């Protein structure tokens, strides 16, 4: 009897503790999902508003690309550094700092009156996103216990990563059509404020790990990619057939890109705290898969940028209609991502990579035939 009493006495508190733990995990999942949605949202929400941004601030065709590039380059170039910062300084602290930076940059970008102002804000958004994304993923693994809770959290994280693109298309169209292009940036401010307020309640601070930042690697890779993109976009042939490959600024930027990227490889081969240890490329399958994803991602970014401008300026679509027009593509990606995950254990990754690359290449070629007289179904929906 005496041994039964302590067990009975602990039952109620145990149930209450379990309830509190459940609420805590629910809040944590809400914060992580919202933060990831906010980061992914900006990959598409601004695209739909690009023609309006161009008219408002007077961007040229090549200059307008940098509204997208400024975000993508800083986000991609500093992503690994953002993850390292969370390990060294504490994940919750760094996560909140990233949210605040992203929100402030969005606010400033919404008030932009010059091209340089908007591009600087977009670059700052990318830095914030590069901090948020890896620390949010780390918080999933440190907050949720292994098993079903963590699996569910990872599923929600992945769903936000994919579904955020669809939300961005619709939200960008609605905000641009009924309010202003500036609201595709302002919308992040209240979302970020809520996440920043709830994050301290949702997460415990992680232990700091000793380590060093690979700043030389982060700087050379980001600047090298920026120089490469600038050189390639500046070298584009104009509509009247004039090529700029021989221009001094093109040659200088491409030379700088080579020097910086070679320096990055050298730094990573010598640094004990390398952001991208070169040994990861010893696995041929992993290297090939990463190369394919690089090619597909590059093509998708270029395609989406071009089509957004095309359907609004040539076909006369509104921002909302263009966002809806791209939804089937996002839906197809979401469905096929689930299908391919089921097929990998059965037939292996290589056949799927080959088939997927071939289908994507065929779709890109089909899209290259689009004209002002093309119909939506045959000219856009089919190849997408």
Residue ranges and their predicted role:
Residues 41, 45, 77, 81, ...:
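Residue positions within transmembrane alpha-helices of multi-pass solute transporters
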Residues 52, 83-84, 88, 174, ...:
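Membrane-interface helix termini in secondary transporters
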